[in-house]
Amino acid sequence: MTTIHNQSRKLLLQALRQGASDIHLSGTREDGIIQFRLNGRLAPFQRIPLQTAERLVSHFKFSAGLDIGERRKPQSGAMDLILEQKIPVSLRVSTLPTPLFEAVAIRLHPQQTPFALESIPLIKRQAQQLISLMTRTQGLILLTGATGSGKTTTLYAMLQKALHMQNLHIVTIEDPIEQLNPAFTQFEMNEKAQLTYEVGLKAALRHDPDVIMIGEIRDQTTAVYAVRAALTGHLVLATIHSANARGTITRLCEMGVALHDLREVVVAIIAQELISRKCPLCLSSDCSPYCTWLNNRKRAAIFDILEGKALQEALTANDSSFDGLGKERRFAIALGYIEEKEAKNRAL
C-alpha cells in the first residue's frame, strides 16, 4: 500500500473512533487543515504539510470516482470501505474549488446496527408517541429539522420498529442510501441514469409496498407524488426542510400541494432538533468535543410532534410562527437534562 493510502485510512479511522460525522480538509498557502465535525461542532484536528494535503485530496477524489484533473468545478462522489471490526463505512465526498485550495468534505456513514427508536428521544414520552405513529397503515408522516439533526436516523428507527411490530414490505427511495438494511427494498437516486425521486416513487408504487420512505421532499413533483402515494392507501414517511413543524404546511403549499389534500392525508408532522446534554464529567453542555465521555451520549433529540387535534388546528390556521420545540426545550431544562444557555442558543 502507498504511504498516502495508509495516511488516508489512518485519518478515516481516527475520525470514526472520535465519532465524527464529517471530515473537512482545507488549506492555506502554507499548510493543510483537517477538522472533524463532532457532536455538531467543528473541531480542529491537525495541520499537515500542504503537499500531503493536496495528495490526500487527489486520493479521495480518485477513490470516490471523481475527475482528479478537474479543479475548477465542484464535484461529488461516493466510496465504500471496511476499516475496522468488519463494519462497512460509506463515504460521500464533496469538493469545492477555492482560490487557495480545493476543499474536501467527507460525510461518514458507518453501516452499523440502527439506533433503537426508544433510545433517540431525550424525553421518553416522545418515544411512545413515535412508536404509536408506526401502527398507522396509511397516511403521510413528515419529519423536518436542520441538516444534521438526525432526521434520517429517526426515520430508519421508525421503520425498524414498524418491521418488528408486523411483517411489512418497506421500500425506501434515497439520495444516497445512508444505511443498508436487507429487510428493506432500497432504491438510490442516480441523476446521470435519470433515476429521480419521481421515477423511484412511480416504481415503488408498482412494487406492492406497505410503507414507502422518501429521503427528502425537495420539489413540487416529489411532494405531489408523496401525497398521491399516501392517498392510495400507503404509509409514507419523508423528510422536508422547513423552519418548524407548522412551517412544513406552508412549505408544502408553496410547492403546489393543495391544503385540502394535506388535511386528508397528513397524520403527523415531526420537528426534530439535536441538543447537547450536560456532561457528567465536565458538568456542562459546553465541554470539549474530544471529551472522553461517550460521544453517542452527548446529544439527544427533542421533538415537536403535531398529530390529532393539534395537527388539524395547525392545518386550519396555517400559522408557521409558533415553534413547539421551545416548549420541549423548557421541559428539558426543568428536568435538568440541558442548560438554559443551550436552549437559548437553539432558540436564536
UniProtKB/Swiss-Prot annotation:
This is Competence protein ComGA. It is found in: Cell membrane. ATP binds at residues 145-152. GO terms for cellular component: plasma membrane. Signal peptide: none annotated. Coiled coil: none annotated. GO terms for molecular function: ATP binding; ATP hydrolysis activity. GO terms for biological process: establishment of competence for transformation. It is a peripheral membrane protein. InterPro entries: ATPase_ComGA (IPR047667), P-loop_NTPase (IPR027417), T2SS/T4SS_dom (IPR001482). It comes from the Bacteria. The keyword Membrane applies. It comes from Halalkalibacterium halodurans (strain ATCC BAA-125 / DSM 18197 / FERM 7344 / JCM 9153 / C-125) (Bacillus halodurans). Required for uptake of DNA by competent cells. Belongs to the GSP E family. PANTHER family: COMG OPERON PROTEIN 1, TYPE II SECRETION SYSTEM PROTEIN GSPE-RELATED. Keywords: ATP-binding, Cell membrane, Competence, Membrane, Nucleotide-binding, Transport.
